[in-house]
């Protein structure tokens, strides 16, 4: 078995820039930025623009974008489709 071919797997803090939430998890990504976590230890921190804390799908704040009534037009066009 080859040695030293696997990436370093370590504890990392992910910082959600949209909501301000922080997650301590393990990952192979690394960063020069560090942060002191609640346990008093210092961990590398990765800034992410969106996570499950701020994504509309997970927060329940998703909206269906209907541009120019396309959904209504589709429903009107195929209203009786498949019925005999």
From Swiss-Prot:
GO terms for biological process: translation. GO terms for molecular function: structural constituent of ribosome. Keywords: Ribonucleoprotein, Ribosomal protein. Part of the 50S ribosomal subunit. This is Large ribosomal subunit protein bL31B. It comes from Renibacterium salmoninarum (strain ATCC 33209 / DSM 20767 / JCM 11484 / NBRC 15589 / NCIMB 2235). GO terms for cellular component: ribonucleoprotein complex; ribosome. The keyword Ribosomal protein applies. The keyword Ligase does not apply. Belongs to the bacterial ribosomal protein bL31 family. Type B subfamily. It holds the Pfam family Ribosomal_L31. The gene is rpmE2. PANTHER family: 50S RIBOSOMAL PROTEIN L31, CHLOROPLASTIC, LARGE RIBOSOMAL SUBUNIT PROTEIN BL31C. InterPro entries: Ribosomal_bL28/bL31-like_sf, Ribosomal_bL31, Ribosomal_bL31_B, Ribosomal_bL31_sf.
